[in-house]
Design a protein with these regions (language model features):
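Thiotemplate assembly-line natural product biosynthesis machinery
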Residues: 1-17, 68-76
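Aromatic/hydrophobic pocket-lining residues that form π-stacking "cages" and hydrophobic walls in ligand
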Residues: 39
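Glycine-rich loop motifs involved in handling phospho/adenylate chemistry
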Residues: 21-31, 54-62
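C-terminal structural segments of small proteins and small subunits
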Residues: 51-76
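Conserved catalytic core of two-component sensor histidine kinases
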Residues: 36
Length: 76
């Protein structure tokens, strides 16, 4: 799943390498518009619905936190 998430991130911001980054927002790699695009794309690609209450920077800080969010959303 991490590979798929990285591919999605690169579609949104192809100029960055996302592997091994601790916090995409602290590094200036993603902004709030990118976050909304990411949520929409994750919903579509993984057939999930990310709750508005889950749209927090810490849930999208890095590949691992995004993967955990997707896994939680699949269980709902």
């Amino acid at each position: 799943m991490q590979k798929q998430i990285i591919e999605i991130l690169k579609e949104i911001r192809p100029e960055f390498e996302f592997e091994g980054v601790e916090n995409f927002f602290d590094e200036g790699m993603l902004d709030s518009f990118d976050l909304m695009t990411l949520v929409s794309t994750l919903d579509e690609r993984f057939s999930i619905k990310i709750d508005g209450t889950d749209i927090l920077p810490e849930n999208f800080a890095n590949v691992e936190s995004i993967e955990a969010l997707v896994q939680r959303s699949k269980k709902r």
